[in-house]
């Protein structure tokens, strides 16, 4: 392997020459003396050379790092020379994605557009963004999907496949691709399907309460789990909760329309239990984050999407209970006790347009929901072994 001293000592000769570093990486020294890092590699049976960077602008370690990244791409069938060429024109996946995104975001909420952009920026574009879109093979797109599957994010994996498919279709109709590999990947994915989430029958709730009382992990995750049960919110709605939208005086939480499934503001009355929990939490996360349930390592983000599931797993209820299961239990028990169906549906944010006679802003139903949610919180607390 090369050393810095060898590189600095390399002088131009009558003919160009190479100083080998290893694994295909070498320093090319032309007659002019302007040294260049290059990587020799083979793909699809053909030998190619990638110009990695110029010395001394790119150090030895930087060249090794870039060569390592290129070799990793090669191992999954990505040609770094083609990727470099594609990144400089408007036929790369990244360039076409940006066109598609600008076209589509006009009909999306700001929150959804931001969430989708983050998914592409974090997990998709770093892998295939620099490739000519017409050269992307199914295996290369599958490599992207595997990133989600490997961390258990099956729903996001399917979402990524569908949205990538839309980018390919956009490329096809604009004359820059002829084939969309996304639909063909469905059979290769790890069995994603819409499923019924686990929930507990009423007679098992006391045992769950007892187990939850033994949890000794993150206080933020524990309070998140309890608030999720008391409010019957969706996990996404809970995670997005901001301190500015928690009104202790009027005892309501407002969930922004951008994160709601129905794209409407959701007003949630707070029971005594929720007020107490959020008051406790305010001394922990409010000084350091806008998020009520701030992440452990990055206070600029909320807790991870699996935080509540991890609590459930730790207390021994994996596969038996879930965040969505809390909502099912709330709906079942409240209907069994003959609370107004409309009030239950509004609390679950199932209301859509005029489906419950426009009662989102009806004071009577907010008052009824205050009463209902206090009854629900008390009912849960009474279920002890």
UniProtKB/Swiss-Prot annotation:
All copies of domain Tyr recombinase, residue ranges: 195-373
Disulphide-bridged cysteine pairs: none
Keyword annotations: DNA integration, DNA recombination, DNA-binding, Viral genome integration, Virus entry into host cell
Residue span(s) of domain Core-binding (CB): 91-172
Matching Gene3D superfamilies: 1.10.150.130, Integrase, DNA-binding domain, Intergrase catalytic core
MF term (GO), any: prophage integrase activity
CDD domains according to UniProt: INT_P4_C
Pfam family, one: Arm-DNA-bind_3
Family named by the database record: Belongs to the 'phage' integrase family.
PANTHER family given in the database record: PROPHAGE INTEGRASE, PROPHAGE INTEGRASE INTS-RELATED
Function: Integrase is necessary for integration of the phage into the host genome by site-specific recombination. In conjunction with excisionase, integrase is also necessary for excision of the prophage from the host genome.
Descriptive protein name: Prophage integrase IntS
Organism the protein comes from: Escherichia coli (strain K12)
């Amino acid at each position: 392997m090369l050393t810095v001293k060898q590189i600095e000592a390399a002088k131009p000769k009558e003919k160009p020459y190479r100083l080998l570093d290893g694994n295909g990486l070498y320093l090319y020294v032309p007659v002019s003396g302007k040294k260049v890092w290059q990587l020799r590699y083979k793909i699809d049976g053909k030998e190619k050379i990638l110009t990695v960077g110029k010395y001394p602008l790119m150090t030895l370690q930087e060249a090794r790092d870039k060569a390592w990244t290129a070799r990793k791409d090669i191992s999954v069938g990505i040609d770094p020379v083609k990727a470099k060429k594609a990144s400089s024109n408007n036929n790369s996946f990244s360039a076409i994605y940006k066109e598609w995104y600008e076209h589509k975001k006009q009909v999306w909420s700001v929150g959804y557009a931001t969430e989708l952009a983050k998914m592409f920026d974090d997990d998709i574009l770093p892998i295939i963004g620099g490739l000519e879109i017409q050269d992307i093979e199914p295996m290369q797109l599958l490599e992207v999907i595997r990133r989600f599957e490997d961390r258990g994010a099956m729903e996001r994996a399917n979402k990524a496949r569908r949205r990538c498919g839309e980018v390919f279709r956009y490329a096809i109709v604009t004359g820059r691709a002829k084939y969309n590999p996304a639909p063909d990947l469905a059979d290769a994915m790890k069995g994603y399907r819409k499923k019924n989430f686990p929930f507990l029958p009423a007679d098992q709730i006391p045992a769950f309460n007892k187990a939850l009382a033994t949890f000794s992990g993150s206080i933020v995750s524990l309070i998140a789990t309890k608030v999720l049960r008391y409010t019957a919110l969706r996990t996404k709605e809970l995670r997005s909760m901001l301190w500015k939208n928690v009104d202790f005086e009027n005892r309501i939480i407002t969930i922004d329309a951008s994160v709601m499934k129905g794209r409407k503001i959701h007003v949630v009355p707070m029971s005594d239990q929720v007020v107490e929990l959020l008051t406790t939490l305010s001394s922990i996360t409010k000084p350091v984050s806008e998020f009520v349930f701030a992440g452990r390592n990055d206070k600029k983000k909320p807790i991870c999407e699996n935080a509540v599931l991890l609590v459930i797993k730790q207390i021994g209820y994996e596969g038996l209970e879930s965040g969505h299961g809390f909502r099912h239990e709330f709906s079942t028990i409240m209907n069994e006790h003959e609370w107004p169906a409309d009030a239950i549906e509004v609390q679950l944010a199932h209301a859509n347009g005029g489906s419950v006679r426009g009662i989102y802003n009806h004071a009577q139903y907010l008052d009824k929901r205050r009463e209902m949610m206090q009854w629900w919180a008390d009912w849960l607390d009474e279920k002890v072994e």
